[in-house]
């Protein structure tokens, strides 16, 4: 378990809508999709869901921490908002994802 004291939420999951912005979000893991070299985590809070993304550019320790996450884990994640290559029109934040560079479980 990581200390989360030095991370402060900058926006809620359902409010992630500005590409290029650095954000800190927190919430519960809704779903984890591990595709080997890519991991996607749907993080939810009271406002909605945002997708967290981990790829080959992600720090190895953070990538491995993401791979160990399961449903209902509580996370804080810091990263840069990016436009998603495949938009999910059923989600309010479906056009964006957070490219994570700091993850606390």
Predicted feature residues:
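OB-fold and OB-like single-stranded nucleic-acid-recognition modules
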Residues: 1-105
């Amino acid at each position: 378990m990581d200390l989360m004291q030095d991370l402060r939420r900058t926006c809620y999951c359902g409010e992630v809508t500005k590409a290029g912005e650095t954000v800190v979000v927190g919430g519960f893991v809704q779903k984890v999709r591990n595709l080997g070299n890519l991991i996607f985590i749907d993080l939810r809070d009271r406002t909605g869901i945002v997708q967290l993304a981990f790829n080959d550019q992600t720090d190895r320790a953070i990538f491995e921490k993401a791979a160990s996450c399961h449903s209902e884990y509580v996370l804080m994640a810091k990263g840069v908002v990016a436009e998603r290559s495949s938009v999910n029109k059923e989600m309010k934040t479906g056009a964006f994802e957070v490219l994570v560079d700091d993850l606390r479980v």
